[in-house]
Amino acid sequence: MTQIPSSDVPGMGRRQFMNLLTFGSVTGVALGALYPVARYFIPPKAAGSGGGTTAKDELGNVVTATGWLSTHPEGDRSLVQGLKGDPTYLIVEGADAIGSYGINAICTHLGCVVPWNSGANKFMCPCHGSQYDATGKVVRGPAPLSLALANVSVEDDNVFVSEWSETDFRTGDKPWWA
């Protein structure tokens, strides 16, 4: 078998090199431009050990326990952005304690956001009059189910909201939303 001399082996020409360089540059710029778009569609995950989502206030700022407790009195139920971006009530249980559970503010009847009525000490849906007690248990229809729960934890002063998979303490049943 004869071997081809090294001078006869075709090399990469200038045109092929420039085409490869242009393709690589355009691909790099396109991927760089698409990265923020891809991140927009992927839900954020928190670094919390519970695998939850970092709670955010109405401006999108991360909620810290010390900041929240300094501006919300005991017994307060105020909204944060929780799982899947749903509004979730954080419950202040004491001068220095956020409750271990949060209440999803989406009505189980037609999906309206249910405001907390502190005077009546219950959640009252403005759409069709459903009412829920202070723990989110339905007490008056037409809503068929209690409000969903979420676990709330504090790690390094950051507040995390995660999926509720335990028994619903209000009914003693498996959670309907899990």
UniProtKB/Swiss-Prot annotation:
[2Fe-2S] cluster binds at C107, H109, C125, H128. Keywords: 2Fe-2S, Disulfide bond, Electron transport, Iron, Iron-sulfur, Membrane, Metal-binding, Thylakoid, Translocase, Transmembrane, Transmembrane helix, Transport. The keyword Cell cycle does not apply. PROSITE patterns: RIESKE, TAT. It is a single-pass membrane protein. Binds 1 [2Fe-2S] cluster per subunit. It is found in: Cellular thylakoid membrane. Disulfide bonds join C112-C127. The keyword Metal-binding applies. One of its GO terms (biological process) is photosynthesis. The chain crosses the membrane at residues 20-42. HAMAP family: Cytb6_f_Rieske (MF_01335). The Rieske iron-sulfur protein is a high potential 2Fe-2S protein. This is Cytochrome b6-f complex iron-sulfur subunit. It comes from Synechococcus sp. (strain CC9902).
